[in-house]
């Protein structure tokens, strides 16, 4: 069993092209909220568990561990995104200089303790958070969810525009696909 270190998390969720990328930066702009993270491996782990490719307990453990590690790495400046045009880039954050200076911070458990006391809020963008809500409640009870709903006609039009539906041909596929065994 592994308990999460960081319990103040806002999960901005919705289907592809629902508007998460507009809402998450607004959440991140609030005081004491970290810059938004896209941690898509969490979706993959939960989908694998939901499809019974891995067991639920393993999925919960992996997600707790991955989120704690990702949030800690964010706090010490590891894996910083310097791509100017990306929505998770430090150049789109409210505190660009502070985020860049984190690479100079001495790492260690004191960072975790400091941010637990400070009640730092982490913001992450994910797909299918409400569909897989049962899994999320097992990760931590304190997470807050903002589920984005969009007119389905507009959503499907955006999917068509972005090539979603031809997902099998996309190299960086975020959807879990399995071949049928005959």
For each feature predicted by the language model, list its residue ranges.
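Hydrophobic anchor at the beta1->P-loop junction of P-loop NTPases
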Residues: 12
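Extreme N-terminal, non-catalytic leader segments
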Residues: 1-9
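PAPS-dependent sulfation machinery
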Residues: 38-124
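A conserved segment at the C-terminal end of the G1
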Residues: 20-34
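A generic secondary-structure signal for well-formed alpha-helical elements
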Residues: 31-37, 160-163
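PAPS-dependent sulfotransferase catalytic domain
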Residues: 112-182
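Walker A (P-loop) phosphate-binding loop of P-loop NTPases
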Residues: 17
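Short, flexible, glycine/charge-rich loop motifs used to bind or transfer phosphoryl groups or to couple energy/partner
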Residues: 1-2, 23-24, 111-113, 135-136
